[in-house]
Design a protein with these regions (language model features):
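Short terminal alpha-helical segments
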Residues: 1-43, 98, 102, 125-129
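Short, charged early-sequence alpha-helical segments and their helix-coil boundaries
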Residues: 50-85
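Short, flexible, mixed-charge glycine/proline-rich loop motifs
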Residues: 118-126, 194-202
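Short cysteine-rich clusters marking metal-coordination/redox-active sites
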Residues: 131-134, 207-210
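Short functional micro-motifs and their immediate structural scaffolds
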Residues: 136-139, 213-216
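Short Cys/His-rich "knuckle" micro-motifs
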Residues: 141-144, 217-221
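Short cysteine/histidine-rich metal-coordination sites, predominantly Zn2+-binding motifs
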Residues: 146-157, 210, 222-226
Length: 226
């Protein structure tokens, strides 16, 4: 007896995860008034009618492509300031997920959903600023939340996709209403302070100590220190 997987079964699994990812992207774009929701809607229609992923793959590229999207109020999207880091990290994760699945489908292979989630985007870099005059480093609330989103969302997206509960996850990100967010933010602030890095809720890019100009600074966290 052959040990090869049932072709029909694995294609149904491919269909399910691909459509889940696209539907989640469409909902996120719809909720935030992003015009790309129409493109994703066409992706879904084309795949369901012809099995082709070419329209979706055509969204990725250079300037003006889906790669350039940033969900924010400045771009006339429907979103609040606090939700921006979560919505954008979720969007990037869903884009990577749908792009990866589309390429597997195009190659006629079976999706290994666990492997896809393992290999998907995970930045885990904390961005802040450092004074060009006195050298004082600091992080802001928005960048702290962006880091936390890159840390917490992968597991949340995986669970939502596997359980077909992406609607609930999107709704939570757009508030944001993330489990243990306050505690996790305080943990990062404490780690930063232990490393001599200040924290500010302000959007001001000037030095908190001396008011001078600053430059972008990046830190990696190992879980215990920065």
């Amino acid at each position: 007896m052959s040990n090869l997987p049932n072709k029909k079964d694995y294609k149904l699994e491919n269909d399910r995860y691909y459509i889940y990812a696209l539907q989640a992207l469409k909902q996120l774009f719809t909720e935030t008034s992003c015009t790309w929701q129409k493109w994703i809607e066409t992706d879904i229609e084309e795949y369901l009618s012809t099995g082709s992923v070419e329209h979706h793959l055509g969204a990725y590229g250079g300037m003006g492509s889906i790669n350039d999207i940033w969900i924010c109020k400045v771009n006339n999207h429907t979103i609040n300031d606090e939700a921006e880091p979560w919505a954008n990290e979720l969007m990037e994760y869903l884009k990577c997920l749908s792009y990866g699945i589309a390429n597997i489908i195009k190659a006629g292979k079976k999706i290994n959903i666990e492997k896809i989630f393992t290999e998907s985007r995970s930045r885990k870099i904390l961005t802040g600023i450092q004074c060009e005059a006195c050298g004082f480093p600091q992080i802001h609330k928005r960048e702290t939340d962006s880091y936390l989103a890159s840390l917490l969302l992968p597991k949340m997206v995986k669970e939502a996709v596997l359980q077909n509960k992406t609607e609930e996850l999107i709704a939570a990100c757009l508030i944001p209403d993330i489990p243990n967010l306050v505690e996790e933010r305080e943990r990062i602030i404490k780690l930063a302070e232990q490393s001599g890095i200040g924290f500010s809720t302000s959007k001001n890019s000037c030095c908190k100590k001396c008011g001078s100009d600053t430059r972008i600074k990046y830190w990696k966290l190992d879980g215990k220190r920065i």
